[in-house]
Swiss-Prot record:
GO terms for cellular component: plasma membrane; proton-transporting ATP synthase complex. Pfam families: ATP-synt_DE, ATP-synt_DE_N. This is ATP synthase epsilon chain. Its main location: membrane. The keyword GTP-binding does not apply. It comes from Xanthomonas campestris pv. campestris (strain ATCC 33913 / DSM 3586 / NCPPB 528 / LMG 568 / P 25). Keywords: ATP synthesis, Cell inner membrane, Cell membrane, CF(1), Hydrogen ion transport, Ion transport, Membrane, Transport. F-type ATPases have 2 components, CF(1) - the catalytic core - and CF(0) - the membrane proton channel. CF(1) has five subunits: alpha(3), beta(3), gamma(1), delta(1), epsilon(1). CF(0) has three main subunits: a, b and c. GO terms for molecular function: ATP binding; proton-transporting ATP synthase activity, rotational mechanism. Produces ATP from ADP in the presence of a proton gradient across the membrane. The lineage of its organism: Bacteria, Pseudomonadati, Pseudomonadota, Gammaproteobacteria, Lysobacterales. It is found in: Cell inner membrane.
């Protein structure tokens, strides 16, 4: 089975590097599935998840805060502000961040940065979804 190298990196660190048979991410215009021999492409990514199917068939879930996806003939590069693997998510901290963002949005005042609160809510929601998907996978 053919593969494509996948690199997921942030400004601070390399988060993942490996061979993949499929990389799925959410671009500005919707879901993208990148397989080996995909046409070159560059697009912005929405906060959401990136799912990498490795050469061994394992699916790895990453929750991202948004970024850029670049596809070249031999490599997919995902440049992100932040990314976290589903199994590394601190559920209690994420739930607290989500509740705080929801509270800020519900009680909007002059000092509330609505865009920041919406971004925080989106990131927390994505992380909780990634965690739930990991739990479902482990049950099977």
């Amino acid at each position: 089975m053919s593969t494509i190298r996948c690199d997921i990196v942030s400004a601070e660190q390399e988060i993942f590097r490996g061979e993949a048979t499929l990389v799925v991410a959410t671009g500005e215009l919707g879901e993208l599935g990148i397989a080996p021999k995909h046409a070159p492409l560059i697009t912005r990514l929405k906060p959401g998840k990136v799912v990498v199917t490795t050469a061994s068939g394992e699916q790895l879930d990453f929750a991202i805060s948004g970024g850029i996806l670049e596809v070249q003939p031999q490599v997919v590069t995902v440049l992100v502000d932040t990314a976290i693997r589903a199994q590394d998510i601190d559920e209690a901290a994420v739930r607290k961040a989500k509740e705080e963002a929801e509270r800020l949005l519900a009680n909007r005042g002059d000092t509330v940065d609505v865009e920041q609160a919406q971004r925080q809510l989106a990131e927390a929601t994505v992380q909780l979804q990634a965690l739930e998907r990991l739990r479902r996978t482990l049950k099977h």
